[in-house]
Amino acid sequence: VLRNHSKVKAWGLEHVPETGPFITAARHVTMYDVFVPMVSMFHQGRRPRYMAKAEMAKWPLIGKWFQLVGMQPVQRRAGKAKAIEETSVEILTSGRPLTVWPEGTVTRDPQKWPMSMKNGVGVIALESSRRLGCQVPLYCAVTWGAASINHWWPWPRKNVVMCYDEALDYADLLDGCDSWGDEVPTDRADELTRRIRVRMTEIMAEIRGEQAPDGYWDYRTMSRVKD
């Protein structure tokens, strides 16, 4: 699908660790852009688990493919967040990489900038780091151009770019982690999630050659809000 519809240029893949667990936090502008980090990781010889809504596993043909490449079904219902986070942490602490889309769904920002994100990515990164006793590498992957692929006709192929950024440092948020108790402090998970969104916005601005708007799009209010 990706090769038929697009010409992908990716940079920064040298940052992908050859071994061990790591987290890729990817942008979600369109349904097509989920394939870009998948293919990129495949060519790097890594096979992450992918957190994706459970309904995708039931899609004709492509659902079976998602399962084969490492899809981790997510039941997106109230009360399931803790179970999803625990499954993700277990994937990482077992030594496997994980890819997540922190926006939770295709962005609703009319201009396609990163919107509000669920702090589960922060919880997963911090808790897995605490259990492993070291900071789990976390990378932002930003794809742009896939939104122009809006039909199944493969020609003309669209240009798609992806930047796989350097590891995002969050060592300061792990200070005192041995005293957290049973749960990651919400303020720390929120802060790490904010850093991911801000960094994604910076990368997106560089790719697009534009200045990002003030604030970010809030999914709950469907409006732009200040940081």
Model-derived segments and spans:
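Catalytic core of membrane glycerolipid acyltransferases/transacylases, capturing the structured
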Residues: 16-78
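A short, well-structured juxtamembrane/interface segment
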Residues: 1-20
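A conserved mid-domain beta-alpha-beta active-site/ligand-binding segment of alpha/beta enzyme cores
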Residues: 171-180, 187-205
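Short, highly charged C-terminal tails/helix-capping segments
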Residues: 208-227
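Catalytic-site beta-strand/loop segments enriched in glycine and acidic/polar residues
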Residues: 91-122
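Residue-level preference for the first positions of well-ordered beta-strands
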Residues: 21-23, 97-101, 137
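Alpha-helical membrane-targeting segments
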Residues: 1-7, 58-69, 153-157
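A cross-family acyltransferase "interaction/gating" segment
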Residues: 16, 111-183, 219
